[in-house]
Amino acid sequence: VRFVVRLLFLACLAATVLVPAGAAADRMWVGFHDDPMFRWDGTRLDALDRARANNATILRTIVDWTKVAPTRPAQATDPFDPAYQFGDVDEFVRNAQQRGTEVLITLWGTPSWANGGQKPQAMPTSLADFQDFARAVASRYSGRYAGYPYVRFFTIWNESNLATFLVPQFNASGKIVSPANYAKLAKAGIAGIKAGNRSAQIGIGETSSNGRDKKSAGTDTVAPATFMKGVAANMKGVKFDAWAQHPYPFPVNQKPTQLVRYPNVTLMSFPRFEKDLDAAFKRKNVPIWITEYGNETKPGEPKGVTEAQQAAYIPQAIGLARKDPRVQMFVWFVMQDSQGSLWQSGIYRQDASPKRAQPVFAKTAKPLSPVNGKMTVRGGTKNPKITVYLREYCANNPAGATVGYTIRSYLKSKLVAVSQGAAPLGLDCTVKPRVAKLTVAKKKTYRVTVTANTATTAEVLRTITIVGA
């Protein structure tokens, strides 16, 4: 039986996610995008276990509107309209939650009933249809319905600067039109997602690393920085949480430190791109989500890198992202090579045997988990409030369940404060206690351990770093 936890939902609307502190991204969500392995393969539970064992804290998935809504829903904003087919998405989100992993949902693809019988890349005839779909998805995974986990992160469309995913890119006279069209999609998607879950975080863009900015033989493409500026010109005043970018090396045998001609955007282009991003949207420090990145390997990709090179490039790529304080997310595409796939960038081969990159990825990702977060507070702050992620608790506890905790604060190795208490488990699978009896001194760093438990779940330990500014 579905039910709505209305009071708790209202209490969680103002909840904020713990933001990494410092001059670098000391914490960021690191994980994989691999729908074939995580959603459809017969070994998907094992694949998800391996993702978690590799210290993934986030898993991206594409929710294809054409597959979820092959026919027009009678009540499109109702997340449980009989026309919707969410079966494998529901299973994936539940399986991720059981493993303590966050989910990023990317909405993409227009059903033929919504665009006059055209392909999924074509714009919907009515943007209200996309807005209604976005609302239904965000509502279904808002945490308000028992058995349907809370999803924190959403992005709108996929590689929208490529005609492979969004058409048209140019009009008949050769003028670039895709940024203005995408801005319409983004505004409709944001409105829908926020109507379904006001605390959701939303990324826009989802741009590929390169494009040509003019019609030519082959697929029409627009360079990501050109595309971004066009989107910004058509989205004045619209709020969003991050720009999502796929800074793949190109050609595929290039290393993470590759330099490319701007307005193409790879990892080394970020300083210039971020300056333009702020100027275009008239904001400061717009966050970046890297929602796809990878290095394909030989022999599956003849033009790819060796497995040894892939292993060497992973810490370089994540290291470049980590040095950038704006980067909040790094998603590797894919976890495992699979039969029939065009991509050979997995850290596992098709037979599930690990490539040399596998232990390197696990080691590199481990210290970056936001679950063991880092925050900066003003010196002199008493009893600072912290956010404790307890995603796995939502698998066996309803929102509002009492979470007991013991908090210990250390200055170097010295125990300086101990407190105990209880707090309700939020719809977003966090608790937000205060670190009682602690006064944060300026220029001091504290290690705060939180031991938490509920009546039905095992004890877990989280470690939060608090820096006095």
Give the location of each predicted region:
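C-terminal segment of classical bacterial N-terminal signal peptides
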Residues: 15-23
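Noncatalytic carbohydrate-binding groove/subsite architecture in carbohydrate-active enzymes
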Residues: 41-44, 131-152, 173-308
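Edge beta-strands of extracellular beta-sandwich domains
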Residues: 459-466
